[in-house]
């Protein structure tokens, strides 16, 4: 349940805090961390904000902020424990009724069991809630995001045991596919989102993925990358970084790049992007264990001790960065924005003249000031780069990617194309002279 659902006088134990980068960090710094007890002290006359007590001091949160904090109600945990105890006692009575010949040892054993049960009954309600919170904390919500045909569905199938079709065709991954997996004591809820080249909301797939990431923020995103086309795939990675969400990259089809002889220091590339990049081959499971181990490390907050787990800002150049900062000043005035979006991400989208971002901002009280700041920033970018702001941002992202690949020593291999046979078949089947006769022939086979 959410912290906002607790009523005055009730208590709970925190399971996890969701939400985007800056907002999530601020809430955690206020003391709302896993395993801590929180008491609801007082609701304001208009029911907002709500005063809480945590770690010995009082703090107020809006309901919209408390919606991002998952808790276990101490009263509910006690109730569930009592139901479990009642079920256990019923089972014991059934077992006892089946015993015909008993003796003192049996009675003693039963007495010992009752004594153990009594000791368990004396456990505090808070301890019960803490145990339940710990159990729920071991549930990780993961979203799979990547370009079409990058191997997302193959990972989904391998990890969850599902049998989704692979391929970017109508009817395949048109909406989110949900599955489950267990690894090293953690339970993973997996969501396979539609393949998309960007988060620009020009297509239904792009809009759907973006909406899911914003409205149903996952604990971790697995950005699946087709390693045979790094530059194109990493463009989506830069946009996910803008959203300030925790992420791990799976460098999929890594065996194909090895066969081709590609050279890349993926460890260095990960440092430059601030993300762990794990070589994988989902068709045979190579790298999957390492991928899920890395997800657990990131989820448990070990990023501070690892250079790969650091949030970076893609440098778009002086004038664009100045424009982003200028817009952010006006966005940060409204706290409700920070609960839903990274203000940097929203600033970039406004500079790109994104219609959905504009629609969201148009309903804010400060909409006029925000749009004025955006227009001023876009004008400066145009004067500086001689390009509209959307094109300038795209060029800057590809410039960052190109520089990172160079620094990571990326060189394409000289071996023959591993898809040479596939490409040859494609050329034959799409030939205007022989393709149609082959199609007719196949219809009659």
Where are these regions (language model features)?
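Compact, glycine-rich, soluble single-domain proteins
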Residues: 1-91
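Helical mechanochemical/support elements of P-loop NTPase systems and associated helical scaffolds
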Residues: 23, 170-174, 186-189, 201, ...
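Charged, amphipathic alpha-helical linker segments immediately N-terminal to NTP-binding catalytic cores
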Residues: 87-119
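Conserved G1/Walker A P-loop phosphate-binding module
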Residues: 106-198
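Conserved nucleotide-binding/hydrolysis micro-motifs of P-loop NTPases
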Residues: 171, 195-196, 227-231, 253-258, ...
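Conserved C-terminal guanine-recognition region of P-loop GTPase G domains, centered on the G4
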Residues: 181-184, 208-277
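Canonical P-loop GTPase G-domain recognition
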Residues: 257-312
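Extended helical scaffolds that flank P-loop GTPase cores
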Residues: 274, 301, 308-445
């Amino acid at each position: 349940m959410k912290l906002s659902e607790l009523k005055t006088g009730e208590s709970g134990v925190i399971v996890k805090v969701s939400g985007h980068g800056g907002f999530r960090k601020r809430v955690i710094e206020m003391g709302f961390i896993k395993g801590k007890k929180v008491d609801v002290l007082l609701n304001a006359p208009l029911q907002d904000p709500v005063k809480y007590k945590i770690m010995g001091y009082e703090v107020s949160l809006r309901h919209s902020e408390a919606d991002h904090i998952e808790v276990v109600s101490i009263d509910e945990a006690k109730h569930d424990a009592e139901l479990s105890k009642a079920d256990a006692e019923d089972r014991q009575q059934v077992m006892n009724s089946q015993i015909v010949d008993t003796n003192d040892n049996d009675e003693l054993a039963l007495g010992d069991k009752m004594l153990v049960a009594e000791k368990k009954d004396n456990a505090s309600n808070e301890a019960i809630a803490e145990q339940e919170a710990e159990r729920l904390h071991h549930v990780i919500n993961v979203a799979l995001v990547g370009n079409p045909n990058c191997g997302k569905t193959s990972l989904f199938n391998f990890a969850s045991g599902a049998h989704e079709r692979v391929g970017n065709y109508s009817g395949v991954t048109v909406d989110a596919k949900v599955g489950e997996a267990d690894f090293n004591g953690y339970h993973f809820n997996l969501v396979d989102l539609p393949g998309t080249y960007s988060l620009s909301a020009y297509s239904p797939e792009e809009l759907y993925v973006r909406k899911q990431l914003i409205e149903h923020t996952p604990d971790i995103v697995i950005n699946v990358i087709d390693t045979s086309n790094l530059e194109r795939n990493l463009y989506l990675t830069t946009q996910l970084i803008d959203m300030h969400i925790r992420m791990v990259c799976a460098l999929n089809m890594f065996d194909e790049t090895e066969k081709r002889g590609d050279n890349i220091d993926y460890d260095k590339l990960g440092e430059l992007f601030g993300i762990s990049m794990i070589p994988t081959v989902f068709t045979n499971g190579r790298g999957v264990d390492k991928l899920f181990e890395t997800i657990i490390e990131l989820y448990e907050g070990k990023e501070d001790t690892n250079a790969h787990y650091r949030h970076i800002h893609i440098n778009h150049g002086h004038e664009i960065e100045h424009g982003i900062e200028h817009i952010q000043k006006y966005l940060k005035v409204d706290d409700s924005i920070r609960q839903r979006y990274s203000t940097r991400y929203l600033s970039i989208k406004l500079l790109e003249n994104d219609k959905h971002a504009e629609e969201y901002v148009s309903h804010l009280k400060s909409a006029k000031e925000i749009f004025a700041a955006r227009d001023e920033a876009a004008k400066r970018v145009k004067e500086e780069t001689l390009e509209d702001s959307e094109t300038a941002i795209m060029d800057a992202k590809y410039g960052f990617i190109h520089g990172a690949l160079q620094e990571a020593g990326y060189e394409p291999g000289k071996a023959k194309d591993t898809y040479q046979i596939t490409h040859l078949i494609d050329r034959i089947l799409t030939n205007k002279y022989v393709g149609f006769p082959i199609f007719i022939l196949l219809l009659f086979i």
